């Protein structure tokens, strides 16, 4: 395992999020190492394209949650889930590669993770935090520098940070309070 014991970190849980590695496993491994070493990420979400990259990350000892992307043969394999839906420290996280795969699971989620667009984005709609980490395809792709996200869940709030893959520098930060009950549409 590549993350430190929980007792050695501040209170709260740290999640790393990456997407659209498209075979760039050198950059993916470098970012995963930063997530673990610099930010103490306990779990890494890999949101597809390429699913085999995520498998490699898991085989390297990281705790990975993964979904296939649209370009992966695994996307068409009914045995492989296209959605992640899990609760961490009382916060429900839903993850997919493309928004079309959400199919209303976001209604029961506090955090929704998506990839596919290669554009990083942090947004709050109602009480739901939407996070797209960007891409790790190349240093620059479609005019966007490679990026990833780090999420910190603490008792009072959830904070997400988009970071540049090349330098780990902060590109964008957004927080949402946790002390308010979620408002869900029926």
PLM ranges: what are they?
Residues 27-28, 104-108, 141-143, 168-177:
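A short, polar/proline- and glycine-enriched secondary-structure boundary/capping micro-motif
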Residues 65, 87-157, 161:
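Conserved beta-sheet core of the metallophosphoesterase superfamily
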Residues 56-72, 76-93, 111:
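Extended active-site neighborhood of metal-dependent phosphoesterases/phosphodiesterases
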Residues 1-64, 79, 144-146, 178-186:
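N-terminal active-site segment of His-dependent metallophosphoesterases
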């Amino acid at each position: 395992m590549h993350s430190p014991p929980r007792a050695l970190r501040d209170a709260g849980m740290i999640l790393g999020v990456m997407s659209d590695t498209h075979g760039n496993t050198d950059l993916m491994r470098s970012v995963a190492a930063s997530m673990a070493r610099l930010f103490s990420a306990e779990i890494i979400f890999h949101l597809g394209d390429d699913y085999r990259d995520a498998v490699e990350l898991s085989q390297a000892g990281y705790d990975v949650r993964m979904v296939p992307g649209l370009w992966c043969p695994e996307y068409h394999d009914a045995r492989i889930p296209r959605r992640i839906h899990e609760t961490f420290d009382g916060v429900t996280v839903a993850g997919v590669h493309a928004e079309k795969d959400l199919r209303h699971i976001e209604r029961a989620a506090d955090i929704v993770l998506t990839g596919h667009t290669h554009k990083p984005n942090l947004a709050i709609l109602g009480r739901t935090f939407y996070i797209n980490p960007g891409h790790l395809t190349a240093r620059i792709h479609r005019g966007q520098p490679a990026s990833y996200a780090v999420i910190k869940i603490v008792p009072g709030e959830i904070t997400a940070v988009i970071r540049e893959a090349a330098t780990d520098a902060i590109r964008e930060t957004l927080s949402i309070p946790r002390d308010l009950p979620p408002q869900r549409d029926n």
